[in-house]
């Protein structure tokens, strides 16, 4: 009894259709990313206050105990920021940041000076002492002193201990300098007695990070509702928004999609709203902070109005383009089409050459998008090595699949399935990454460009198969697991995350043919 029964001839138009759709989708993805998007203008190009952390260059991180930012570097940053901002917010006194008030004063800027608190009592004492000395030395430069940032959210201090630290600072600095504590708005409602210890409330409203993430289209309305709620909850207390903003890169959360366009949309609309209610606010943040990726994934590093090289990411007026050099994606697609036509369509007829070229266009566009994602996501040599190796492997498998597809379409006959073991490998990778997304997906990107190559390639080939070996039990198990995990991810995202739906689509593209083969083999076996 044969385990690889042959099937009669069938139409090849579904395979052609899928190839064309894949190529058009790849080109269309890049084209849409390069279209200017019209947005409402900001009421002004100046912003009241912005979070300032100088750790923007490669290798810089506040977790380095020996890190020190020179006064010259801070001077350079604040001189540039003074052209756009009236105030900067800092978070710590250490690593050279105690110099900020004196330097900001030179440029006519105010400072929301931070004192960093955590569970280290000795470090807290040093921060508090330095903060008190700074406030006494430069009271005229300060818009306020913020004692602690989200320390209750992190669970590193009790409300009682935090209150004692706040009152210590309040008693030691000039009365003209107001004192506050900053945390997510929900924690102020959870610990309302903390309001008695501060001169005003500093609340963080980050629509992207809410437990129920808010889309950019509704984000400012959400901020307005929360701000009004906090004013009602704490009558007689001034309420300041200490952090608000939107990320430009990273993992979507439900309908909250990080992008340059969405960051520009949010900030412009927020500034317009803030102008109507005349509230104090601070936006996060001045510069992208690549070091945050180690804690919060890709998305953590890209909340800046300026990139890590101090270049503005978008204008505050006029159209905004997501990927200005979008044509590089088309160039990669053209290179992929030429490469595949030469290597996979070699010695084929016109139809085989065209099929290989279409596969190459789709592969080139997908790999270019994956490369762009890697540029933002990879934090070290290990990340780069693993990512590049995965892309090379995906390209090799895609090229081999394209050869089989070109052979099948060129002769109008069924193709054999190459590298069955590699299909198992990619199914395993999909299932494994799906598990990570389900149980630890908060900060994980969707590597759609990487997995598009094998998933779509095997889907096209399934429409052209001739020899059909029985898929192994392991393949069948993974072909169930990967889509089921994809469904769970979609449900976790409440059906609002387009990236999650695309991930599920890729899982189905490679998994469904496994069961189609299994059914056909069982049907044809005596």
Segments and roles (model prediction):
Residues 28-80, 84:
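Boundary/entry segment of secreted carbohydrate-active catalytic domains
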Residues 107, 113, 143, 149, ...:
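Aromatic- and acid-rich polysaccharide-binding/catalytic face
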């Amino acid at each position: 009894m044969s385990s690889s029964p042959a099937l009669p001839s069938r139409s090849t138009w579904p395979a052609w259709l899928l190839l064309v759709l894949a190529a058009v989708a790849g080109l269309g993805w890049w084209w849409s990313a390069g279209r200017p998007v019209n947005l409402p203008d900001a009421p002004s190009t100046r912003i009241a206050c912005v979070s300032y952390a100088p750790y923007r260059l490669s290798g810089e991180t506040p977790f380095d105990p020996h890190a020190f930012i020179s006064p010259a570097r801070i001077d350079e940053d604040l001189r540039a920021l003074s052209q756009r901002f009236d105030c900067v917010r800092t978070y710590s006194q250490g690593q050279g940041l105690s110099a900020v008030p004196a330097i900001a004063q030179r440029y006519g800027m105010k400072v929301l000076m931070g004192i960093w608190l955590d569970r280290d009592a000795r470090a807290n004492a040093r921060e508090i002492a330095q903060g008190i000395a700074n406030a006494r030395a430069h009271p005229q430069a300060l818009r306020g002193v913020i004692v602690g940032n989200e320390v209750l959210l992190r669970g590193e201090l009790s409300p009682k201990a935090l209150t004692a630290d706040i009152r210590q600072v309040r008693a030691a600095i000039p009365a003209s300098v107001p004192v506050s504590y900053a945390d997510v708005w929900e924690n102020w409602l959870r610990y309302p007695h903390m309001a008695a210890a501060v001169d005003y409330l500093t609340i963080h409203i980050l629509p992207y990070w809410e437990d129920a993430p808010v889309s950019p289209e509704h984000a400012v309305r959400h901020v307005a509702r929360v701000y009004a709620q906090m004013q009602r909850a704490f009558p007689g207390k001034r309420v300041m928004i200490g952090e608000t903003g939107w990320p430009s890169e990273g993992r979507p959360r439900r309908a909250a999609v990080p992008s340059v366009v969405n960051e520009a949309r949010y900030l412009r609309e927020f500034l317009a709203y803030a102008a109507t209610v005349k509230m104090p606010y601070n936006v996060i943040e001045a510069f992208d902070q690549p070091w945050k990726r180690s804690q919060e994934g890709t998305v953590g590093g890209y909340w800046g109005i300026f990139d890590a090289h101090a270049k503005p990411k978008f204008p505050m007026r006029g159209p905004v383009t997501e990927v200005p050099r979008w044509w590089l994606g088309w160039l990669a697609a053209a290179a992929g089409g030429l490469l595949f036509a030469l290597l996979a369509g070699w010695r084929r007829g016109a139809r085989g050459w065209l099929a290989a070229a279409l596969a190459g266009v789709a592969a080139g566009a997908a790999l270019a998008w994956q490369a762009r994602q890697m540029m933002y996501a990879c934090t070290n040599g290990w990340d780069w090595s693993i990512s590049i190796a995965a892309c090379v492997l995906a390209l090799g498998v895609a090229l081999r699949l394209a050869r089989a597809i070109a052979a099948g379409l060129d002769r109008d006959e069924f193709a054999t399935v190459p590298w069955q073991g590699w299909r198992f490998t990619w199914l395993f990778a999909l299932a494994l990454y799906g598990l990570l997304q389900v149980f630890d997906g908060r900060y994980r990107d969707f590597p759609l460009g990487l997995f598009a190559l094998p998933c779509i390639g095997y889907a096209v080939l399934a429409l052209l198969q001739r020899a059909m070996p029985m898929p192994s039990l392991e393949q069948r198990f993974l072909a169930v697991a990967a889509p089921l995990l994809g469904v769970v991810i979609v449900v976790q995202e409440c059906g609002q995350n387009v990236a999650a739906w695309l991930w599920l689509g890729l899982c189905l593209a490679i998994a469904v043919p496994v069961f189609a083969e299994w059914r056909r083999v069982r049907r044809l076996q005596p």
